[in-house]
C-alpha cells in the first residue's frame, strides 16, 4: 500500500526535473550555429568523391588528379596552409597532411552573397585556422607543398564549409 505523501513528492520532483530538461534542451539549441559555406564556380559539373582523411592517406596514389571532398582541421601560419586529420588518434605531422592551395582562379564566396572568404568583412577576416573544415578540390601528388614537406596538395579548392 502506497502512502499518499509518496505520490505527491514524486509529482513535485518531476516538475523541476522537467523544467530543467526543457531549459537544457533550449540552451543546446541556441549553441548550434549554422555552417558557413563558401563556394566557387570552378569545377561545376564535376563529381566529387567524399572520402575520410585516413582513407585518403592510406591510398593516396589512387586519388591522384581525382576530385574529392574531405574534412579535417585547417592549419595556417606563416608559410603554412595545411589540412590535417582532426582525429585525436592520428599523426598530425606534415608527412600526414595535405597542402591546401587556394587559387585566385577559384574565388570562394559565401553562398548567396559576394562576400569572399579572404575579404575583410564585418570588422575582420573569416577565421578558419584551427577549425574543422570540409574542402572540395583535386588531389595532386606531384605537388608536395611548401618545401616538399607534405604528402600531396589539394588544388582548385571550390568549396569550404565551416
Where are these predicted regions, by residue range?
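Sec-dependent bacterial lipoprotein signal peptides
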Residues: 2-29
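OB-fold and OB-like single-stranded nucleic-acid-recognition modules
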Residues: 31-162
